[in-house]
Regions:
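NAD(P)+-binding Rossmann beta1-loop-alpha1 motif at the extreme N-terminus of oxidoreductases
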Residues: 1-38, 110, 172-174
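Small-residue helix-packing motif on alpha-helices
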Residues: 15, 43, 177-184, 206, ...
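Short acidic-hydrophobic, aromatic-tinged amphipathic segments that line or gate anion-handling sites
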Residues: 35-40, 139-141
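NAD(P)-dependent Rossmann-like dehydrogenase/reductase catalytic/cofactor-binding core
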Residues: 186-242
């Protein structure tokens, strides 16, 4: 997220971080022009918005002792399975909001699932949503759907990367150099996504627009149907939500 904010024009000097391995943290922060802090207490003291990017099982241990110091701060959670209700148990009375970003936020093309329920004031929420909007598309969801949206947006990049790799392999099989194969496939995925977002067209209609009667594309579509592509993708999401 820090890389995405820096790319979007947020001053690196306005950001700081802490981590378990301080030496490695210093190196990464220096590369970006950020400040490295020795512990979470330093981060909270230096910040207005505190991004909670720790493993879910560590949250209570890390944040409960910081409750008083966080009284006039905003906690922006990116922790999996930690919704507003859970945070309120650990930090009652503290302003907090739960989100699930994905890896493309680092290039400002991410999707961030954002829980509608929060303890933020209207002004605080507007500030946070403005910051998140610099990283990509923000989708506000009910609490019951936050981690469903987070799963589709956050886990599916791995599935798309597998598809890019497989299509790249197919191109290489038929003679395209590897680097060119990935350029072709990745740009195709990017362009197709942009077309759908720009037009709002149903994906099925987009597919039909490419399929000529008796043509090559419809034969490929049938091959994918025979291989169970749709079912495999649905099952992948089902598995991640179990």
């Amino acid at each position: 997220m820090a890389d995405g904010w820096i790319a979007a024009g947020v001053a690196a000097g306005d950001m700081c971080a802490c981590a378990g391995r301080y030496d490695a943290l210093v190196e990464r922060c220096e590369e970006r022009g950020m400040a490295a802090c020795h512990d979470a207490t330093e981060v909270v003291a230096a910040s207005d918005i505190v991004v909670a990017a720790v493993k879910p099982y560590m949250i209570e241990k890390v944040f409960a002792p910081l409750k008083d110091a966080l009284a006039d701060k905003v906690v922006l959670s990116v922790a999996w399975t930690w919704d507003s209700a859970k945070w309120e148990q650990v930090l009652p009375g503290v302003a907090h909001i739960s989100t699930v970003p994905n890896t493309p936020v680092s290039v400002d093309e991410g999707v961030i699932a954002c829980e509608k329920a929060s303890t933020l004031s209207d002004e605080q929420r507007a500030t946070v949503l403005g910051l998140l909007g610099k990283l990509g598309t923000v989708v506000e969801l009910d609490s019951s759907l936050l981690f469903v949206g987070g799963t589709v947006g956050g886990c599916a990049p791995a599935f798309v990367a597998m598809a890019i790799e497989a299509l790249g392999d197919a191109a290489v099989k038929h003679g395209i150099p590897r680097a060119d194969a990935y350029r072709i496939v990745s740009q195709m995925v990017l362009g197709t996504a942009k077309l759908q977002l720009a037009t709002g067209q149903h994906p099925a209609a987009m597919k039909d627009a490419v399929c000529s009667p008796g043509g090559a594309t419809i034969k490929g579509v049938v091959a994918l149907e025979d291989a169970g592509m749709r079912s495999a993708l649905v099952k992948a999401i089902d598995a991640t939500l179990q």
